[in-house]
Design a protein with these regions (language model features):
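A surface-exposed partner-binding patch
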Residues: 1-104, 154-158
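Compact, glycine/acidic-enriched structural inserts
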Residues: 124-148
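Active-site donor-binding loop signature of nucleotide-sugar glycosyltransferases
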Residues: 101, 112, 122
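Catalytic Cys-His active-site segments of thiol-dependent hydrolases/isopeptidases
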Residues: 118-124
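Short, surface-exposed beta-strand/loop micro-motifs that present aromatic residues
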Residues: 106-111
């Protein structure tokens, strides 16, 4: 079990349902269960090191559904507001829901097509490519489910 600190106020299923309806999406049970326990926050074990072809990446924090005391509830710091803002600016494709970020502002996303977890490297944007080509190039598959992602995070010394 991976514990989280600096979480926002607890939320109920109705808060998540409201976001699902607003975004016209359905979230997987493991994602919902996690957020009912931890609304955002910082994982105790924060490093993803699941692939020998890539450097490990650290999760700086998970985005809350509602309430963000660190940003005075700035809508862009919440799951739905970040998603809408990134879609409006064409930063991410429609099927990726950012739920966490690393220290460089890159996103850990839930792929809404199959509920896998994808790392999206916004800091590697290539101006010579089209937006669609960038959307493909900047994605790195991490694992097949949210639960596997959270449980697969390790402490730095591991």
């Amino acid at each position: 079990m991976n514990h989280f600190s600096n979480c926002e106020k607890k939320i109920g299923r109705a808060d998540i349902t409201k976001t699902e309806e607003k975004l016209s999406i359905t979230l997987p049970d493991d994602f919902v269960s996690h957020y009912l326990q931890f609304n955002g926050g910082t994982p105790e074990k924060s490093w993803w090191d699941g692939d020998e072809d890539f450097e490990p990446v650290e999760v700086a924090g998970f985005k809350p559904f509602v309430y963000n005391s660190q940003t005075n509830n700035d809508p862009r710091s919440l799951i739905d507001g970040c998603y809408i803002s990134m879609l409006d600016r064409e930063v991410i494709p429609k099927n990726l829901l950012p739920f966490a970020n690393d220290w460089g502002g890159n996103f850990f996303c839930l792929d809404l097509d199959n509920y896998s977890i994808v790392y999206f490297a916004t800091d590697s944007f290539d101006e010579d490519l089209t937006m669609q080509e960038n959307h493909i190039k900047l994605q790195r598959y991490l694992t097949n489910s949210f639960a596997n992602f959270v449980n697969g995070l390790v402490a730095e010394e591991d």
